[in-house]
Amino acid sequence: MPEQLSLRDQLHVRLQEKLRRELGAAVLDALADPRVIEVMLNPDGRLWIDELGVGMRDTGSRISAAQAENLLGTVAATLGYVITPERPVLEGELNLDGSRVCGLLPPVVLAPAFCIRKAAALVYGLDDYVRDGILDGVVLPTLASIDPAPTCGHAAILRHAIRTRQNILVVGGTQSGKTTLANGLLHELTTSVGSTQRVLTIEETRELRCTVPNHVALRTTETVDMTRLVRTALRLRPDRIIVGEVRGAEALAMLKSWNTGHPGGIATVHANDARAGLIRLEQLVQEANVPPQPALIAEAVDLIVVIVRTPTGRKITEIARVHGASASGYVLEPIDPTIVEQTPQMHRHLIAL
């Protein structure tokens, strides 16, 4: 160990080396593979991966209970935490690459288990979503002579929403790609506003990838929750407030911030369709010990984007505008993907036809 390293740095290096040994070749290879999304160890010792274009599969590799327990202990040590049978749940980030890790020990499982969700190595932009058929956005023949050729449909609607500072709620089920889509919207935000706006991101685990130059990333701790961070963000002179996954009482603070001079936000929520996403927000708002607040929700949320996971991949199936709330429920306008978002350049071209 080089003498110039402090004792703390030496400990960090040793923990990193120990972590790599205990992860083993199979896990390290999976983490290095850009096609792999998640790496999972079941209590029976089988190692599974979720791979783009393939789905879930057994790697054929096995990890013993003793090795898995040692691994989780080392991960906990890198996080300044201890995982024991009395504290059998570990959640945090793998400090090798920022991947999210959740580990379990008996008695909550029969034998040690974990799931590692890899940090996004690349950010998919909206053009990538269109190219892969996840997002509707085709070039109309009458507009093909414009350079660059504009797209119509949902892609154009999302770009317009980003430019005009609409609040966007990304809705989807487990593993539907909500965070990846939020990162795609953040990428579009970077290309649209550059350094002209200050963006604050708030999340429990660092998964959002924001490349806006004027950006502050906030993350919860055991003593600072999401609600506290949203309120703190308001004192940091934000132009836009982006919330990773809304899962609790922070929904109320977020909606109020979007509604009081900080439009252009993005957030994700777990639900199966646009209307269910708003109802889910109602449920989360009530965790702040207030009534459901449908009027506030309808005023704060401008656009809902629904992404689903299908047997063949991800697909954005629905985009809807929120026009208000009534006694019978929310007033939503599903957006037809054949609609063209007319930029001034497109408008001049169409007039000339």
Residue map of PLM features:
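N-terminal accessory targeting/assembly segments
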Residues: 1-96
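NTP-binding/hydrolysis catalytic cores, primarily Walker-type P-loop NTPases
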Residues: 8-20, 297, 311-353
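Solvent-exposed alpha-helical segments within well-ordered globular domains of core cellular machineries
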Residues: 17, 29, 66-77, 156, ...
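Residue-level signature of catalytic and energy-coupling elements of molecular machines
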Residues: 39, 103, 262, 301
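Short, surface-exposed polybasic-and-hydrophobic patches located at secondary-structure transitions
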Residues: 49-63, 116, 314-325
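P-loop NTP-binding catalytic core
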Residues: 56-73, 77-164
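Switch/coupling sub-region of P-loop NTPases
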Residues: 155, 165-173, 180, 184-300, ...
